[in-house]
C-alpha cells in the first residue's frame, strides 16, 4: 500500500545551521510511526516539516520533498491552511485555548465556516467521544478547557484536532507532560485512532515507541540512522548506534 | 498610599461644602466670582473622552496588533517601536502645540472638541499601543501555534484566540487612557479654548472638567468651586480604576478555570 506521507531527500536549515540531513522516510497509511532519538536530534523539526509549522519560524529553510498522497506540500501553489486542516497536530504541552470546552473543540470547524449550532453540537460530541473525553466532560461543556487536568487537557487538544477531520495526526511528545495513567490513556486512544488516521509521534520515551508504534525511525544529529518495523528496530537493530541508543547506552 | 489618601481626602473634604445637585446641573456663569455649576463641562468631558476613545482605540489596537503579530523584525519596525516609546515620554503641552498647529490652524477645526479629541488621541496613542503590545505578548505562543495548526489563518488566530486572551490587558489600557484623557489639561488648553458654554456640536469649543478646575483656580476667586469640581473628577477617576480592577479580575477568573 502506498505510504500516506513520503519524505524524499529533505535537508532542513535554521539560518546556516543544518538540522536535518538528506532524510528519506515513509509514514504508512493508518499506522503509527514513531520518531525517536536524543534531544536536539531534529525529531520535532522533522515532525513539523510535515504540516509546515516550521514556516512560522524565521530563518527556516527546507530542501527536498514532503509528499502527502504524492503531492508535494512545499510546492508553491499549495494552500498551507488547507494542509494544516488535513494534517493536525498535538503539542508537547497541552495548549487548550482560554475558552470553554465546547468552544475549544468547535474552534476548528468554526474557522472552516460552520456556524449551524446543531452541526457544531454534533461535531463536538463526536470528537469528544473519539478522544475518550466525552463521559468526563459532557455535563460541563461550558467550563473552561483550562480547568481540566493535564491528561484531560491533552485529550481535549486531540478532540480539537479530530473536529476538523484531518487525515494525519502529528503528536509532538504528547505525553511528556503527563502522569503514567494519563499517558496510558493517550496510548490506548492512539490505537483506536489509527483505524481511521495516520499518526506520526515524536517521543523520547523508547518504551512508548516500542509499545505504541508500528514503524520507527531513529534520528541522530539530523541523520536518519535506521527506519523500519518497530518490532525489528527494537529486537534486531541493524546499526550499532541504534542498538546503543535503544539499550540506553546514551541519549 | 497614605499620601494618596491624604490628597483625595483633602480634596473631597474641601470640595464637599460646594457640592450639591444644583452644582451638577447648572452651567458655569463665568466671571471673576466663578458662579454657577459644572453641567456644561460634564457634557463637554463626556463628548471629549468618548470621541477620543473612538479615534484612539481602533488605531492604537490596530497598530499594536500589526507590530506584535505581523511586522517583520527589521530596521523600520525597530524605528517605529523606538518612536512609540519616545513619544510616550513627550510632555503633553508639546502635543498641544502640535494639535494647535495641525488641527486648530491647518485643518481649520478651530478651538473645538474635535481638535481636543484628536490631540488627546495623538498623546495617548503611544500609551495604548504599549499597553496593548504588552497584553498581546503575554499571550502564550502555544495559543498561536495551536490555532495555526488547526488550519486557522493568521487573522483568524488573532481575532478568535489572541485578542480574546489579551482582552483584559487591553481593556485595562483603554480605561487607563480614559483616565488620562479625563485628567489632561495642558494640551486641551491650546486646542479646545476655554468656552464654558454648553457644546452644540463636536466643532464647538469647550472646557473639560479638568480644564475647568484649572480656570477656576487661576482666573477666579472660587477656590471652593474648583475643589468641588476636582472632587467630582476624582470620584470619576477612582471609579474608573475600580472598574479596571473589576474587569481584569473577572476575566482572570473566567480564563483560569471555574465556571
UniProtKB/Swiss-Prot annotation, chain A:
Recorded catalytic activity of this chain's protein: phosphate(out) + ATP + H2O = ADP + 2 phosphate(in) + H(+)
GO cellular component: plasma membrane
Topology relative to the membrane: Peripheral membrane protein
Protein name: Phosphate import ATP-binding protein PstB
UniProt EC number: 7.3.2.1
PROSITE patterns: ABC_TRANSPORTER_1, ABC_TRANSPORTER_2, PSTB
Family: Belongs to the ABC transporter superfamily. Phosphate importer (TC 3.A.1.7) family.
Subcellular location: Cell membrane
GO molecular-function terms, A-Z: ATP binding; ATP hydrolysis activity; ATPase-coupled phosphate ion transmembrane transporter activity
Lineage: Bacteria, Bacillati, Chloroflexota, Dehalococcoidia, Dehalococcoidales
NCBIfam families, per the entry: 3a0107s01c2
